[in-house]
Each structure stands twice: as C-alpha cells, then as structure tokens.
Curated annotation (Swiss-Prot):
Ca(2+) 3 binds at residues 93, 95, 97, 104. Residues 7-42, 43-78, 80-115, 116-151 form the EF-hand domain. It is a lipid-anchor. Residues 154-183 are annotated as: Disordered. GO terms for molecular function: calcium ion binding; enzyme regulator activity. This is Calmodulin-like protein 3. The modification Cysteine methyl ester is found at residue 180. Keywords: Calcium, Lipoprotein, Membrane, Metal-binding, Methylation, Palmitate, Prenylation, Repeat. The lineage of its organism: Eukaryota, Viridiplantae, Streptophyta, Embryophyta, Tracheophyta. It comes from the Eukaryota. A lipid is attached at residue 180 (S-farnesyl cysteine). Signal peptide: none annotated. It comes from Oryza sativa subsp. japonica (Rice). It is found in: Membrane.
Length: 183
C-alpha cells in the first residue's frame, strides 16, 4: 500500500470501522457496497461480487482491512486510468462530437504508423460498438479499454495492449507511459 497516503489510509480505516459492526476487523460483502458509497464510489452488485472474489481468498464473504486497502488502491488506479482513457478518447475523436467514427479510427491508426486494413477496422468497431450504431461512444470506448487494461494487468503485461482478436501487438498509443491500449 506504498502508493496510498497516510491520510487516505486513515480515511479508509475510518470508513471501514463505521461498517465493521461487531468490531472484529472484517466487513461483509453487503457492507462493502455501503463503504464504497461513503467514499464516493457506486459499484453495481456484480462489481461488488467481483471485488469481493478478488480479495476474499477464503470465500467467507468478509473482507479484512488489509484486503480492503488493496481493493481501494486498485479502484483508485482505475480512476486514474479513466482519466488517461478520456484523454485517449479525445485523441481518437477528432471532431470532438463524442463519437469515434470509422474514418477517425482509421486516421489515428495511420498516424501511429500502423494503417488498418478494412477487416481490422471492422473487427475493432465490432468489438467496441456495443449499440451497433457504427461508431464508438465514450462509454463503449471506456468499457473496452478498462477490460483490456485489467486483462493486461492480470497477464502481467503492464500498460501494453493488443488489438482485437487478431493478436497484432501495439502499445502506448497515446504516449510512451500511457495506460492507453489499442482497441
């Protein structure tokens, strides 16, 4: 937890203790949602379940404070990653209308010295365009990018990424130290 400040740890301890009803040093998965809400987060039930599964090694449904700190540290990193992803979206969205069109995607990829074939472009759009309107809105972009980021972190690849299902490697689309990966 080196990357958390003393103030953050104290704030998280205070929130944790508020919901540790019996003072045994653990909170239940249901209480976790309340704690996250008090810290300005609003995870869904599915997200809460996944968070608990990630940290609750014994499957008890309870989380100890150290596990809770790890969970919040990851959540804070993801929030920082969202800022990076928002910046990346702006790079792709040339006309700043809130959508990445096929032409904008092709243009940015060509400027990255990696032009897309029509099939690659179609694959990338298909993967990201969940509402089927032929373009990528910010929420679609965020969903794909965060999923890629989590996958890369789980695989131990840091901030690099890969493209769609065709396995062409590409990393750092928006800068050498960026968490941005190509769709």
């Amino acid at each position: 937890m080196d990357h958390l400040t003393k103030e953050q740890i104290a704030e998280f301890r205070e929130a944790f203790n508020l919901f540790d009803k019996d003072g045994d040093g653990t909170i239940t998965s249901k209480e976790l949602g309340t704690v996250m809400g008090s810290l300005g987060q609003s995870p869904t039930e599915a997200e809460l379940k996944k968070m608990v599964e990630e940290v609750d090694a014994d499957g008890s449904g309870s989380i100890e404070f150290e596990e809770f700190l790890g969970l919040l540290a990851r959540k804070l990193r993801d929030t920082g990653a969202e800022d990076d992803i928002r910046d990346a979206f702006r790079v792709f969205d040339k006309d700043q209308n809130g959508f990445i069109t096929p032409d904008e995607l092709r243009h940015v990829m060509a400027n990255l010295s990696d032009p897309l074939s029509d099939d690659e472009l179609a694959d990338m759009l298909h993967e990201a365009d969940s509402d089927g309107d032929g373009q990528i809105n910010y929420n679609e972009f965020l969903k794909v990018m965060m999923a890629k980021r989590r996958q890369n972190m789980m695989e131990g690849h840091g901030s690099g990424g890969h493209r769609s299902s065709n396995s062409h490697k590409k990393s750092g689309c928006c800068g050498p130290n960026s968490s941005c990966t190509i769709l």
